[in-house]
């Protein structure tokens, strides 16, 4: 099971007027990183969602049974994951595609 979350935490610097529903993100490249000026980027786990969807869609890959789990509210209590019923997932291994190293 490939697991990732769908939601984003919209945050901005207090000195900036930005409406996350209507204003675009001002993204830029900084070395190997894509960053945003004055706001969160909004790509927190988007790469993991894209990865899971690409693996599921690619019929040329050889693999066993796959499933994807997309949750919400991982930052404020794991609401999406907590709502899962026991036995809903069939996989024996869950790959959490949203982790980071301490200090990163």
Residue ranges of predicted features:
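Active-site metal-coordination/substrate-binding segment of hydrolases
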Residues: 1-70, 74-77, 81-92
């Amino acid at each position: 099971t490939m697991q990732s979350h769908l939601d984003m935490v919209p945050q901005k610097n207090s000195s900036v007027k930005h409406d996350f529903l209507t204003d675009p993100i001002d993204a830029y490249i900084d070395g190997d990183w894509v960053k945003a000026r004055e706001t969160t980027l909004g790509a927190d786990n988007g790469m993991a969602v894209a990865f899971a969807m690409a693996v599921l869609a690619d019929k040329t890959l050889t693999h066993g049974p796959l499933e994807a789990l997309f949750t919400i509210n991982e930052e404020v209590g794991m609401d999406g994951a907590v709502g899962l019923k026991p036995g809903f997932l069939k996989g024996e291994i869950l790959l959490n595609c949203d982790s980071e190293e301490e200090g990163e």
